[in-house]
Swiss-Prot record:
(2R)-2-phosphoglycerate binds at residues 163, 338, 367-368, 389. Binds a second Mg(2+) ion via substrate during catalysis. This is Enolase. GO terms for biological process: glycolytic process. The keyword Transmembrane does not apply. GO terms for molecular function: magnesium ion binding; phosphopyruvate hydratase activity. CDD domains: enolase (cd03313). SUPFAM superfamilies: Enolase C-terminal domain-like, Enolase N-terminal domain-like. GO terms for cellular component: cell surface; extracellular region; phosphopyruvate hydratase complex. The gene is eno. Pfam families: Enolase_C (PF00113), Enolase_N (PF03952). It comes from Paracidovorax citrulli (strain AAC00-1) (Acidovorax citrulli). The active site is at 205 (proton donor), 338 (proton acceptor).
Amino acid sequence: MSAIVDIVGREVLDSRGNPTVECDVLLESGVMGRAAVPSGASTGSREAIELRDGDKSRYLGKGVLKAVEHINTEISEAVLGLDASEQAFLDKTLIDLDGTDNKSRLGANAMLAVSMAVARAAAEESGLPLYRYLGGMGGLQLPVPMMNVINGGAHANNSLDLQEFMIIPVGAPSFREAVRWGAEVFHALKKIINDKGMSTAVGDEGGFAPSVENHEAAIQLILQAIDAAGYTAGEQIALGLDCAASEFYKDGHYVLEGEGGIRLTAQQWTDMLATWVDKYPIISIEDGMAEGDWDGWKHLTERLGKNVQLVGDDLFVTNTRILKEGIDKDIGNSILIKINQIGTLTETFAAIEMAKRAGYTAVISHRSGETEDSTIADIAVGTNAGQIKTGSLSRSDRIAKYNQLLRIEEDLGDIAHYPGRAAFYNLR
């Protein structure tokens, strides 16, 4: 009864008004699974390829009709009749059908839409919520949210080079309370920014995007908001940064326009980050160095890797081959997990498992271009990942994930576990 009998791909829109791929999978029993894939703005060069049409007369060349056509033709022909409960076999079928190392022929967006929709259909068929279907009886842990309350870089139109300034409610007793704490800080921050005469417009991920004099000014705004909301920075709410350093790495230097255009070597940039870590309660730094600057990453890890979570996003691109190289070379201590960077659920889960075995944390993440699809919330719980990045406390495309996690926590009841600071088990 779990045989796949129909697949339909379609072009829909993401949160930036750009096309993305959605897929419906129908099983013999009559149940259906639906999934839509996200899209990034700052992307790693080694990510699986997102297939776009390139036709400038439609959506400025960003249409995805080719990817949709692949779903409705050769992917459909290859997977019709397969058992939806055999996720690994289905994903391998997609990988073999594509035949490239980076999924450039069929498109990772086409393949992921099918992979996710099949999992949703199989979960529905089994009568289990998606998180339980994906993780079995072990999925009891809610993730600690890393909430992006100030946006910069490629996600905003302001003077900040760093892409995300996040609050992390490590002291909350539950996920529900963590969300409440985050929302209250978000609203306090809005008032502070407004009272200073700055814009309260939000960026792609729902955080504010004020034009401030430098990066420390942004951090200080957040600390003021934490205090105004009645919480203690560090003890109750820690800070995290996503530098997205590849975006400002030019000719072997880190060029910070938001700091007066200074040009820093990797060592000097590490010194600046270390100064911030000493001065502020920062416990996580993502993409602190450019994806190709492995020497810089090594220096950063040696300097800060014992007391700060160093997350590789563009560095590892959810790819087990690259992650293994990083583990072998002691680069970073955490991986960001973005399902569309690799293109199938099976490969996503393999990256999470590899990270955990090596003592690295795995942070489940959205993309800046999102939809109402909340699959990553279920993945975070199903894999006991412990951490999630899904934006600020605004924009329905971000809130969809928080709301799904609230439902999951309610469903788990007394056995739900919120790890708080223990989710950062890579810190000594």
